[in-house]
Every structure is written in C-alpha cells, then in structure tokens.
From Swiss-Prot:
Cofactor field: Mg(2+)
Protein name: Ribulose bisphosphate carboxylase large chain
Reactions mediated catalytically: 2 (2R)-3-phosphoglycerate + 2 H(+) = D-ribulose 1,5-bisphosphate + CO2 + H2O; D-ribulose 1,5-bisphosphate + O2 = 2-phosphoglycolate + (2R)-3-phosphoglycerate + 2 H(+)
Gene responsible for this protein: rbcL-A
Residues modified as N-acetylproline: P3
Enzyme class, first EC level, given as a word: lyase
Localization, UniProt: Plastid, Chloroplast
Propeptide residue intervals: 1-2
Function: RuBisCO catalyzes two reactions: the carboxylation of D-ribulose 1,5-bisphosphate, the primary event in carbon dioxide fixation, as well as the oxidative fragmentation of the pentose substrate in the photorespiration process. Both reactions occur simultaneously and in competition at the same active site.
GO molecular function: magnesium ion binding; monooxygenase activity; ribulose-bisphosphate carboxylase activity
Swiss-Prot/TrEMBL site (Transition state stabilizer) positions: K334
Length: 475
C-alpha cells in the first residue's frame, strides 16, 4: 500500500503555510445579489500588507485557517469562501483601510443572527496580524432577510394598537433606577402616565432584585396602567423588563405580562443574547405584545472608532432578530451620537430601502424587503429645551424618552409629564405649520410656557443644562 504522503501528492495537496491573499484576495470578484457584504476598518500591524490583512479577515471569518489542510479538497472552496474584493485607504489615517468582504449566502444558518455574528465577528477580531479591526457595516441580502421574522409588529401596527398618530411617542424611565419598592415604583408609573406620557420604562438594570421582585413590579405597574387609562381615555404602556438569567425565565415573565393584558414588554438584547431575543420576538408576535429593546453594553462594543462593531451593524442585527423599539441615541443629550451618523442608522431601522451614503456612514444600499421597521428611541439626558431639536431630527416615528427630564420636575412626576407633552405637541404643531424648529424652536417653547405653568417651571430648571462634548466616533 502506498504511503499516505504519496496519495496526498497525487490529489494535489501540498502541506505548509501560504499567504492568505493567494486564495482570499480577489479584486476581480463580481458581487452577487445573494452575498452578505461587510465593510471592515482594518489597522494592520507594521509591515503587513493590507491585501494580506484583508484576505486574512475574509479567510478567518469564513473557510480559512492558518495552514493548508488536506480536507480542503473534500469541498468547494470557491463556493464557500469569503472574498476580500476591494480595499480603500481611510482618509486622514496613516495605516487604516476599509476592506470589503463578500460572504456566500450558504455560510449562514437561516434566521440566525447568532450564527451570522459567530462567523463574521468571531475569532478574526483577535487575529495577531491586525492591530485593530472594526466592522463598520453589513449588507444583508434580500434572500437572507427573508429567512427572518424581524420586529414582532412594526411601526404602523404599533400605532394602530395604541391609536396614536401624527406625533412622536413620549416615554420616561423610572428613577431612581434601583432601590424603589414595587408599590412606590407603580405610583411613579401612574403619575407619569396620568400626566400625559404614552409609556414608562423599567431601567435596564431592573430585573428581579431583592428590593423588588419582578412579579410584584408587574402587578403594580399593570394597576398603574389601567388606572391611568381609565382617567385619560388613552392607551398607556410600561416597558416591563422580561430580561432574566435564563431564556425559560424570560419567557415565563413574558407570559405573565400577557396574562395581565399589558401592551408591551422589554428586553436587553445584547446582554440577553440574540438567541433569547429572537425567541422572545417570536413569542411577542404570536401573542400580541409589543417589544421594546434596550441596548445595554453597546458602548463596550461600538464606541472605539478603530476596533469593535459600529452601532449601525448592531441596529441591523436587531432588525433581523426582532424588536419594535430600539434605543438609538439622541444627538442632543448626554449619550454619544453624532448627528449624520445617528440619522443614518435611524433610517436603517425605520425605512424599507436605504441607499448607500458614505456621508452618513452607510457603506451599502440596504433593501429590507418585507421586514417591519423599528421605532428609534431617543433617551439620555434630554429635557424640554431639547424638544424642538428632537422633533426636527427624529420626526414622528420615534419614542422620546425623558427620565430625569420628567421625574426631576420641581413640582413632581405628573407635572413633569405634562410639561413634556405640551412641549411635544407645541413643536409638532409648529412644524406642521411650516416653522423652522432649528431656528425658531426656542420661541415655540417660550410661547407654550405662557399657557402651561408646568412647562414654564421645567424650562426654568433646565435652561442652563447642556452636554457638549466632542463625539468619540466620527466619520
């Protein structure tokens, strides 16, 4: 019997290490409509050619490994391998490049964000030849989009459920975020909803701690919702956080919320995980619950401009996994959010079709096919003086979330809610009349103060509050 080495030689196998670019750098490749496309910001180690780094990213996130293996001959690498098909230097940076990589559709399990991310943002981010690597954008092909359910309901269905049209929605995160008893928590919920808000929200930190177990919180919040609805004649909701230590416990909390008859629940999709989030989204569609998504942990992943994952990619992942709301930053509050970049991923959340626009950080044209849109949630250090800018920036299909900007009102929670509602309706009316909120917004708010003492008091408290810092992540 011939030695194994002779058999390998006859089959064309040659052991050893060869440059990735010999196999995975293919600048002549014609991208297919079914491909998943990725734009990576690469910082190669000194002395490593960008072509080799781009090819390494394509290889290590698809079929490649560090050495030639004889089992390559048992499959079709041309069919399954990722390809670095283009490189471009990053303007203003000495050693950064955008590497464009195309992945065949068959590399990914249908309907699984978990599998998609395991491949594309897996071990390759620890690759030694790279000093830093950031996933800037993904193009999700229509063929792959059609394997996902997406949002449980979407923007239009939510408006129909709430019977609220023609303005943005108002919310408030209950503060202090930790330490309240369930009864006192429910009292704050009632006061905010009674004062004019559409929603109140569990802070992402609130799960089921010793000071307030989840079942008690759900019961007192449901009581608050029904009382506020009866007194205002409006449909109200509270984002009951179903996030838990296990998927089974998460679904148990969702079931209890459904039994209480509340309209909406909440999940932390990054800390809870994509698999758990997708399971919850399926449950919510089947049972008529809206799903509010918080992005706790996102800044660990997306804030550094040369390493990690840009939030526009995390937003796309959520649109696939499923959620009716997603926190998106504010541009004007205390949390990170550069205007054009924020508007770029807000459009990616809401619109069915978004054209490539590098001025807003959108690297690929994205067609979402029939996936429902996700409502952006603006929250973090915002108050009534920000309302003109928020209405101008986000339009009507957004939820404006005032936590301290409601509960910090000098007269209490209900007046704080009333101040926000008056400010929102005044700005919406002014916009509808053709007024320029960017230029006249302050005048609109001051005019409304004349007939709303609650708004006047809020304006006096927060007239000097600003959060003006340079953004860390810029184009």
């Amino acid at each position: 019997m011939a030695p194994q080495t002779e058999t390998q030689a006859k089959a064309g196998f040659k052991a050893g290490v060869k440059d990735y670019r010999l196999t995975y750098y293919t600048p002549d490749y014609q991208v297919k409509d079914t491909d998943i496309l990725a734009a990576f910001r690469m910082t190669p180690q000194p002395g490593v050619p960008p072509e080799e780094c781009g090819a390494a990213v394509a290889a290590e996130s698809s079929t490649g490994t560090w050495t030639t293996v004889w089992t390559d001959g048992l499959t079709s690498l041309d069919r399954y391998k990722g390809r670095c098909y283009d490189l471009e230097p990053v303007a203003g940076e000495d050693n950064q490049y955008i590497a464009y990589v195309a992945y065949p559709l068959d590399l990914f399990e249908e309907g699984s964000v978990t599998n998609l991310f395991t491949s594309i943002v897996g071990n390759v981010f620890g690759f030694k030849a790279l000093r830093a690597l950031r996933l800037e954008d993904l193009r999700i092909s229509v063929a792959y989009c059609k394997t996902f359910q997406g949002a449980p309901h979407g923007i239009q269905v939510e408006r129909d459920k709430l019977n609220k049209y023609g303005r943005g929605l108002l919310g408030c995160t209950i503060k202090p975020k930790l330490g309240l008893s369930a009864k006192n928590y429910g009292r704050a919920v009632y006061e905010c909803l009674r004062g004019g808000l559409d929603f109140t929200k569990d802070d992402e930190n609130v799960n089921s701690q010793p000071f307030m177990r989840w079942r008690d919180r759900f019961l007192f919040c449901a009581e608050a919702i029904y009382k506020a609805q009866a007194e205002t004649g409006e449909i109200k909701g509270h984002y009951l956080n179903a996030t838990a230590g296990t998927s089974e416990e998460m679904l148990k909390r969702a079931v209890f919320a459904k039994e209480l008859g509340v309209p909406i629940i909440m999940h932390d999709y990054l800390t809870g995980g994509f698999t758990a989030n997708t399971s919850l989204a399926y449950y919510c569609r089947d049972n008529g619950l809206l799903l509010h998504i918080h992005r706790a942990m996102h800044a660990v992943i997306d804030r550094q401009r040369n390493h990690g994952i840009h939030f526009r990619v995390l937003a796309k992942a959520l649109r696939l996994s499923g959620g009716d709301h997603l926190h998106s930053g504010t541009v004007v509050g205390k949390l990170e959010g550069e205007r054009e970049v924020t508007l770029g991923f807000v459009d990616l959340m809401r619109d069915a079709y978004v054209e490539k626009d590098r001025s807003r950080g959108i690297y690929f044209t994205q067609d979402w096919a029939s996936l429902p849109g996700v409502m952006p949630v603006a929250s973090g250090g915002i108050h009534v003086w920000h309302m003109p800018a928020l209405v101008e920036i986000f339009g009507d299909d957004a939820c404006l979330q005032f936590g301290g900007g409601t509960l910090g009102h000098p007269w209490g929670n209900a007046p704080g809610a009333a101040a926000n509602r008056v400010a929102l309706e005044a700005c919406t009316q002014a916009r509808n009349e053709g007024r320029d909120l960017a230029r006249e917004g302050g005048d609109v708010i001051r005019a409304a103060c004349k007939w709303s003492p609650e708004l006047a008091a809020a304006c006096e408290v927060w007239k000097e509050i600003k959060f003006e810092f340079d953004t860390v992540d810029t184009l």
